From Swiss-Prot:
This is Exodeoxyribonuclease 7 large subunit. InterPro entries: Exonuc_VII_L, Exonuc_VII_lsu_C, OB-fold_nuc-bd_dom. Signal peptide: none annotated. GO terms for molecular function: exodeoxyribonuclease VII activity; nucleic acid binding. The gene is xseA.
Amino acid sequence: MPSAKSTPDTPWPVRDVNNQVKNWIERLGHLWVEGQLAQINVKPNWKLSYLTLRDVEQEVSVQLTCPTEIIRNRPTPLKDGDRVIVYGKPAFYAGRGSFSLWVTDIRPVGIGQLLARIEELRRQLAAEGLFDPARKKRLPFLPKCVGLITGRGSAAERDVLSVARDRWPEVQFKVINTAVQGASAVPEIIAALGELDQDPGVDVIIIARGGGSVEDLLPFSEEALQRAVAAAQTPVVSAIGHEPDTPILDNVADLRAATPTDAAKRVVPDVNEERLLIRQLRDRGAAALRGWVAREQQALASIRTRPVLADPMTPIVRRREEVERAVSLLRRDVNHMLRTEQSLVASLRAQVSALGPSATLARGYSVVQVVPRDGTPPQVVTTIEQTPPGSQLRIRVADGAITAAAMNTQKSD
């Protein structure tokens, strides 16, 4: 084991590096590891067999080395895509710098266990809100381009393409073929989903597979795929086509279709149905317009038959006669009022004249005023004491005034 620190001046040789790695790996001890089998390489005359164990969610794998008799003695043969749990010890071969897992036991993951894990994951994702209808995106009415993820040359691909093009011949497809079962299915589907989701020309994505066994459909319940679908900006349709067992993808996708054919029908409208609908709407619109025109014509005819429009001058003449009568009555009332008021004024004038000083003077009476010598206004004489002899007097009669002087005064008895 090297004691010096690795530096540019004192680098470690490859053998020392490999020995260090080997020592560290050997300290890990025995491990239980779960994954999916792939690339099973078994020869009857070999003592050792070589397999690849892949992660169920990511593109990660590890090489397995195990005695051939372990595989030969199994009650059912192993095949690619089997979910298994292996027991082994990590081993690093320093001579060629390779890592593998030395396996001494291989156990299949039971269907019951797998279904229990799926249901547990289903509950977890539901609690996180991934199944919430509020987060599901609406599909476009008429997609210009449909993304399709499915197996190469599969019946699902043929069904979707043929049904969709029969319904709407102008629809375009961007098809990405992936594995739809086995260890590589999930990473390939996620990669295809990401590519289609990033394409601005793709309006909706269909993930399709034409059914299969529970084991075959396991990739469509893997957590990584569910989170990728939930994060996609483009609407995703699940078309797995397996009614008894519902993959989690059916819950997370924006729309679940029973089969690939059903997906094509629900994603792409039928041109014949749309043409029929357009004709029906056009006929309904024309009927509604004709009905409206008929009602308006009837209303106009009703208005035209009214007397005021049949003889428009008669109401005017009638109103003019009413105005003339009103003017005549008003003139008569005004004249009557004027005569009444004139008579009242004449009567009041006569009363004023009869009661005024002029009428009294006309009957021979007079008003005697003494004219003070200091120029002050004349004073009406009411007593002889106001007119001592020599006082200048002003005597007012009916038709004028007389100036006189007081000669003497005589007190009445």
